[in-house]
Amino acid sequence: MKILLATFFFQLSLVAFSQNKYGVKPILLEQYKASIKSNPEKELVDLEKFIPHIVLDIRYATTNNFTKEKIYNMAKAYARKPVAAALRKAQADFKKLGYGIKIYDAYRPYSATVKFYEVMKGDTTYVANPYKGSRHNRGCALDMTLVLLKTGKELQMPTAWDAMQKASWPSTPVANPEVRKNRDTLISVMEKNGFKVYTTEWWHFDFVGWEKFEVMGIDFEELEK
């Protein structure tokens, strides 16, 4: 009997591990719905509807990204309610300068973080660690740049989005004064409005207070229902 019980619990543990081999249990749709009933601040907001003139260029809904694969089935940008509110304030500040926001990525389902980690073979210099989950998984991170409001043209930045090189680091000196000004303007306005730039990516901004929000594993199709 003891052997049978031991075998049974061992098999159960194997099933649990195979379902979540990195030890993170992202909340799913029903848990998310329950969480926003108790705390409306946890709601995911559609940024395209919430922020006037925002531009979406969701690269993970295309093959134009470092994986060379289409990761998302829909080109959507969601963020938690206070994140969206802070971004709308930043958009108003950028508008005074003649700029608008272009979003490359916002909320990211946990499954995408696992995919990126495995593509990078465990190197977490430029992708998140699935043993912890990412700020994107919490709806509290944004990948973005600036565009000219009059033309929609992107401002020149030190590198392309998702360029995995030291030139992408916000701390890296930039010789071109216009490019340096563009990068520094993006960072200063975002940090004024409650975000923190990521140490290795000039385009990545974490909402200050992201720790209060759970890792989520909800697909965009579910959010759109």
Residue ranges with predicted function:
Residues 18-104, 119-200, 209-225:
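Extracytoplasmic cell-surface/polysaccharide-interacting catalytic and binding patches
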Residues 116:
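Short active-site loop/helix that positions an aromatic residue
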Residues 205:
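Conserved metal-phosphate-binding beta-hairpin within the catalytic cores
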Residues 112:
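Short, well-ordered surface patches within globular domains
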Residues 109:
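Segments that shape or occlude catalytic/ligand-binding pockets
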Residues 1-23:
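Bacterial Sec-dependent N-terminal signal peptides
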